[in-house]
Amino acid sequence: MRITQGTFSFLPDLTDEQIKKQIDYMISKKLAIGIEYTNDIHPRNSFWEMWGLPLFEVTDPAPVLFEINACRKAKSNFYIKVVGFSSERGIESTIISFIVNRPKHEPGFNLIRQEDKSRSIKYSIQAYETYKPEDQRY
Protein backbone atom coordinates (compact mmCIF):
# COMPACT_ATOMS: atom_id res chain seq x y z
CA MET A 1 0.00 0.00 0.00
CA ARG A 2 1.60 3.27 -1.08
CA ILE A 3 1.39 5.92 1.64
CA THR A 4 0.09 9.28 0.40
CA GLN A 5 1.31 12.17 2.54
CA GLY A 6 2.70 15.49 1.38
CA THR A 7 2.56 17.71 -1.66
CA PHE A 8 3.32 15.21 -4.43
CA SER A 9 2.00 12.06 -2.78
CA PHE A 10 -0.17 10.88 -5.68
CA LEU A 11 2.61 11.28 -8.26
CA PRO A 12 5.44 8.81 -8.89
CA ASP A 13 8.47 9.23 -6.63
CA LEU A 14 10.45 12.37 -7.40
CA THR A 15 13.82 12.00 -9.08
CA ASP A 16 16.85 13.73 -7.58
CA GLU A 17 16.63 16.37 -10.32
CA GLN A 18 12.97 17.06 -9.45
CA ILE A 19 13.88 17.22 -5.75
CA LYS A 20 16.61 19.75 -6.62
CA LYS A 21 14.06 21.91 -8.45
CA GLN A 22 11.73 21.84 -5.45
CA ILE A 23 14.61 22.84 -3.18
CA ASP A 24 15.40 25.71 -5.59
CA TYR A 25 11.75 26.78 -5.24
CA MET A 26 12.00 26.68 -1.43
CA ILE A 27 15.20 28.72 -1.54
CA SER A 28 13.54 31.31 -3.81
CA LYS A 29 10.71 31.64 -1.26
CA LYS A 30 13.24 32.00 1.60
CA LEU A 31 11.90 28.96 3.45
CA ALA A 32 13.78 27.16 6.21
CA ILE A 33 14.38 23.62 4.96
CA GLY A 34 14.24 20.60 7.23
CA ILE A 35 14.71 16.88 6.69
CA GLU A 36 12.61 14.51 8.80
CA TYR A 37 12.24 10.73 9.04
CA THR A 38 9.94 8.18 10.69
CA ASN A 39 8.97 4.54 10.73
CA ASP A 40 5.53 5.30 12.19
CA ILE A 41 3.59 6.62 9.21
CA HIS A 42 0.18 7.04 10.89
CA PRO A 43 -1.62 9.98 9.20
CA ARG A 44 -1.89 11.86 12.51
CA ASN A 45 1.80 11.43 13.31
CA SER A 46 2.90 14.91 12.32
CA PHE A 47 5.97 14.92 14.57
CA TRP A 48 8.69 13.07 12.70
CA GLU A 49 12.31 12.89 13.87
CA MET A 50 14.54 15.74 12.67
CA TRP A 51 17.65 14.87 10.70
CA GLY A 52 20.15 17.39 12.00
CA LEU A 53 19.15 21.01 12.31
CA PRO A 54 16.92 22.92 9.89
CA LEU A 55 18.83 24.70 7.15
CA PHE A 56 18.19 28.46 7.33
CA GLU A 57 19.06 30.98 4.62
CA VAL A 58 20.41 28.35 2.23
CA THR A 59 21.39 29.79 -1.16
CA ASP A 60 22.35 26.57 -2.96
CA PRO A 61 20.53 23.20 -3.06
CA ALA A 62 23.80 21.21 -2.73
CA PRO A 63 23.94 21.16 1.11
CA VAL A 64 20.29 20.11 1.29
CA LEU A 65 20.84 17.30 -1.22
CA PHE A 66 23.93 16.24 0.74
CA GLU A 67 21.85 15.95 3.93
CA ILE A 68 19.04 14.11 2.11
CA ASN A 69 21.53 11.54 0.79
CA ALA A 70 23.17 11.17 4.21
CA CYS A 71 19.75 10.54 5.75
CA ARG A 72 18.88 8.06 2.97
CA LYS A 73 22.11 6.19 3.67
CA ALA A 74 21.58 6.04 7.44
CA LYS A 75 17.80 5.51 7.40
CA SER A 76 17.23 3.60 4.14
CA ASN A 77 14.17 1.72 5.43
CA PHE A 78 12.44 4.80 6.83
CA TYR A 79 10.14 7.38 5.33
CA ILE A 80 12.09 10.59 4.75
CA LYS A 81 10.55 13.93 3.85
CA VAL A 82 11.73 17.43 3.07
CA VAL A 83 9.85 20.25 4.77
CA GLY A 84 9.81 23.95 3.84
CA PHE A 85 8.86 26.24 6.74
CA SER A 86 7.93 29.90 6.39
CA SER A 87 8.76 32.22 9.28
CA GLU A 88 6.86 35.09 7.65
CA ARG A 89 4.66 36.88 10.16
CA GLY A 90 1.10 35.63 9.89
CA ILE A 91 2.10 32.36 8.22
CA GLU A 92 4.72 30.73 10.48
CA SER A 93 3.93 27.25 9.23
CA THR A 94 4.96 24.45 6.92
CA ILE A 95 4.40 25.56 3.32
CA ILE A 96 5.56 22.47 1.48
CA SER A 97 6.55 18.91 2.39
CA PHE A 98 7.18 15.85 0.26
CA ILE A 99 8.49 12.33 0.74
CA VAL A 100 11.92 11.62 -0.77
CA ASN A 101 12.47 8.07 0.54
CA ARG A 102 10.23 5.10 1.31
CA PRO A 103 10.81 1.60 2.66
CA LYS A 104 10.92 -1.10 0.00
CA HIS A 105 7.78 -2.68 1.47
CA GLU A 106 4.82 -0.59 2.69
CA PRO A 107 2.41 -3.00 4.44
CA GLY A 108 -0.45 -0.57 5.10
CA PHE A 109 -2.91 -0.20 7.98
CA ASN A 110 -5.26 -2.30 10.07
CA LEU A 111 -8.80 -0.91 10.46
CA ILE A 112 -9.93 -1.30 14.07
CA ARG A 113 -13.66 -1.23 14.87
CA GLN A 114 -14.95 -0.71 18.41
CA GLU A 115 -18.56 -0.91 19.49
CA ASP A 116 -19.59 1.95 21.73
CA LYS A 117 -22.73 3.12 23.51
CA SER A 118 -26.03 3.04 21.62
CA ARG A 119 -24.66 0.62 19.02
CA SER A 120 -22.38 3.25 17.55
CA ILE A 121 -19.07 2.11 16.11
CA LYS A 122 -15.76 3.92 16.46
CA TYR A 123 -13.07 3.40 13.84
CA SER A 124 -9.34 3.83 14.11
CA ILE A 125 -6.33 2.68 12.14
CA GLN A 126 -2.97 1.26 13.15
CA ALA A 127 0.00 0.68 10.88
CA TYR A 128 0.82 -3.02 10.64
CA GLU A 129 4.47 -2.17 11.22
CA THR A 130 3.74 -0.77 14.70
CA TYR A 131 3.02 -4.32 15.89
CA LYS A 132 6.79 -4.87 15.69
CA PRO A 133 9.35 -3.29 18.05
CA GLU A 134 10.60 0.08 16.82
CA ASP A 135 14.03 -1.20 15.77
CA GLN A 136 12.53 -4.06 13.70
CA ARG A 137 10.10 -2.11 11.52
CA TYR A 138 10.56 -2.26 7.76
From Swiss-Prot:
Pfam families: RuBisCO_small. One of its GO terms (cellular component) is chloroplast. Coiled coil: none annotated. It comes from the Eukaryota. It is found in: Plastid, Chloroplast. Keywords: Calvin cycle, Carbon dioxide fixation, Chloroplast, Photorespiration, Photosynthesis, Plastid. One of its GO terms (biological process) is reductive pentose-phosphate cycle. GO terms for molecular function: ribulose-bisphosphate carboxylase activity. In this alga, in contrast to plants, the small subunit is encoded in the chloroplast. Although originally identified as Cyanidium caldarium, these sequences derive from Galdieria sulphuraria. This is Ribulose bisphosphate carboxylase small subunit. It comes from Galdieria sulphuraria (Red alga).
